Design a protein with these regions (language model features):
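HAD-like aspartate-dependent phosphatase fold
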Residues: 1-422
Length: 422
């Protein structure tokens, strides 16, 4: 991997969507995500109604780089060498003595020192982006509730209910208001079945009032994307969001003609598997009316696709650029889903979009209050304030500032640094 990054040297520029090109209004979207899951757990799975009440102080628990041990409900923060820096059982922080007794100076049980990455992904969940963080708070409060109800319960099995909540709120069919199917009976008459979709709380709310939860993209970013295309760059949009939700986000943030900005759009990419899985494991699918159709043995032309893999994509990029080794850079906000897999498996250059670099509106870095004094979500009169975490300037010329270059190179050299230091 090159130690010096030049955007001008790249043939292909790819982007994630959520929290990268699409900036969310986090003080509104975070409670929406939390409530989407909490209501499902209370209504469908019988969890304590106290989960529905969140105080401003509760949000201070949210912190990037937490790993949840799915068996015992413990959240840990790892050092680069795999030792545990701090931990909490649910939301209850362990004292230094408790931490020493539970973990000592040994590597965490799921950490593999030769790769520098945790193993056994079915045993833990890693929270490294703002879409997931409300779920971390919910899981911690679930662990608190179960511990209280069951007199110090040590092991848990609530993760299956969290997964069910994810499926309910974010499955591919959840975005659609209705699904129409037809069936012919023996008398050759047709019956039309109308199945109500629009599941959960999240998608209906976003569709009802997108301006409450999303920020439009600055014109400077649109201009920059157009300049990249004019300079002969191939532009990619690779998102794990489904096709219909991707359209809603892009139309609101980039405009109705957003598709003209990109040569290839890939939705439901199922990252990080898009980068790590083989073509046979993750083929591309065509789309019709936002629903997946036939699988493709290869990717032969630009367009809009679903799922897929970076290997077949790269073969297409070779044809489009007429180069045996086109250079690709990918912008994303998640170390787990974007930065590490794109760099490690696909050998792409990567740029981490780190919202925290901005600080407060109008403040110089040296004047800003230290981050350790602040939670990730600021409140006033019981309501999360509109703190400007994302800097779209990172997607313009300042993407090549010394600060971001330093951050990117450090991440490429030490892919677990986010766990310990973010």
């Amino acid at each position: 991997m090159a130690q010096h990054f030049s955007l001008a040297a790249c043939d292909v520029v790819g982007f994630d969507l959520d929290h990268t090109l699409c900036r969310y209004n986090l003080p509104e979207s975070a409670p929406l995500i939390y409530n989407s899951f909490a209501r499902f757990l209370v209504k469908e799975k019988g969890y304590d109604k106290e989960l529905l009440t969140v105080t401003p102080e509760d949000w201070d628990f949210c912190c990037k780089g937490l790993a949840l041990d799915l068996e015992d409900g413990t959240f840990i923060k790892l050092a680069e060498n795999g030792t545990v820096l701090r931990a909490s059982h649910g939301t209850k922080m362990m004292t230094p003595d408790m931490l020493a007794e539970a973990y000592g100076k040994k590597e965490w049980k799921y950490f593999v020192s030769d790769t520098g990455m945790p193993s056994h992904p079915g045993k833990y969940y890693f929270y490294d982006n703002y879409f997931d963080l409300p779920g971390a708070l919910l899981c911690a409060r679930v662990a608190d509730s179960l511990t209280k109800q069951n007199s110090g319960q040590k092991t848990f099995d609530f993760w299956k209910d969290i997964v069910a909540g994810i499926q309910h709120n974010f499955k591919m069919s959840a975005f659609k208001a209705y699904r129409f199917t037809t069936a012919w009976n023996s008398s050759s008459s047709c019956a039309i079945h109308i199945e109500k979709k629009n599941c959960g709380l999240y998608f209906p709310e976003i569709k009802r009032d997108p301006g409450k939860y999303l920020h439009s993209c600055p014109e400077s970013v649109r201009n920059w994307l157009q300049q990249l295309k004019s300079a002969g760059k191939i532009l990619l949009l690779i998102t794990s969001s489904h096709s219909d939700y991707c359209k809603l986000l892009c139309e609101y943030t980039l405009g109705d003609d957003f598709a003209d900005l990109f040569d290839i759009v890939i939705t439901n990419a199922l990252k990080p598997g898009f980068f790590s899985h083989s073509p046979s494991q993750r083929p591309f699918y065509t789309l019709k009316d936002d629903e997946e159709q036939e699988s493709l043995p290869s990717l032969d032309k630009p367009g809009w696709y679903s799922q897929g893999n970076s290997a077949h994509l790269y073969e297409l990029l070779k044809k489009m650029t007429s180069k045996p080794k086109p250079k690709v850079v990918y912008f994303g906000d998640s170390m787990h889903s974007d930065i590490f897999p794109a760099s490690h498996y696909s050998h792409w250059e990567t740029v981490l979009i780190l919202e925290e670099l901005r600080g407060e509106e109008g403040e110089k870095p040296e004047e800003a209050e230290p981050l350790e004094k602040k939670g990730k979500y600021e409140f006033l009169n019981g309501k999360i304030q509109r703190t400007p975490w994302f800097i779209h300037g990172l997607l313009t010329k300042s993407v090549l500032t010394a600060l971001l270059q330093f951050q990117v190179l450090k991440q490429l050299q030490h892919p677990t640094m986010t766990i310990a230091e973010m």
